[in-house]
């Protein structure tokens, strides 16, 4: 039995799941009720009638906080393999982890000094 024969099962499963998905999608689309009235076409805003435009502008500080969150979230992602293999780490691994943490800490202190996190 070759490698190509083993992939036949995967292709059959993929074809069946794709066909079933397409059939169910079109079945739901053609059987749904298509009654459009004014209340159904309005946007839902916490049970109240919508007032104002939903596409308002955001303050730039929200974006800065989001970027900082992404940076430190990635830091945790990069530090996870170190924490899992801490018993078998060498001196080089420890030094690389320490340099990585120092660079991120310096960046965080720089953000605080520049006032990127001040909301006043």
Curated annotation (Swiss-Prot):
It is a multi-pass membrane protein. It is an enzyme of class 7 (translocase). It comes from Dictyostelium discoideum (Social amoeba). Belongs to the complex I subunit 3 family. This is NADH-ubiquinone oxidoreductase chain 3. The chain crosses the membrane at residues 7-27, 62-82, 89-109. It holds the Pfam family Oxidored_q4. GO terms for cellular component: mitochondrial membrane; respiratory chain complex I. Core subunit of the mitochondrial membrane respiratory chain NADH dehydrogenase (Complex I) that is believed to belong to the minimal assembly required for catalysis. Complex I functions in the transfer of electrons from NADH to the respiratory chain. The immediate electron acceptor for the enzyme is believed to be ubiquinone. It catalyses: a ubiquinone + NADH + 5 H(+)(in) = a ubiquinol + NAD(+) + 4 H(+)(out). It is found in: Mitochondrion membrane. The keyword Lipoprotein does not apply. Its EC number is 7.1.1.2.
């Amino acid at each position: 039995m070759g490698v190509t024969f083993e992939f036949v099962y995967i292709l059959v499963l993929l074809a069946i799941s794709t066909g079933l998905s397409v059939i169910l999608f079109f079945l739901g689309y053609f059987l749904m009720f298509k009654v459009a009235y004014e209340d159904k076409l309005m946007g839902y805003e916490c049970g109240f009638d919508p007032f104002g435009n939903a596409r308002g502008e955001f303050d730039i500080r929200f974006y800065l906080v989001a970027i900082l969150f992404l940076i430190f979230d990635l830091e945790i992602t990069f530090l996870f393999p170190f924490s899992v293999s801490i018993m078998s780490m060498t001196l080089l691994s420890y030094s690389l982890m320490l340099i990585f943490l120092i660079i991120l800490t310096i960046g965080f202190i720089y953000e605080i000094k520049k006032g990127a996190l001040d909301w006043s």
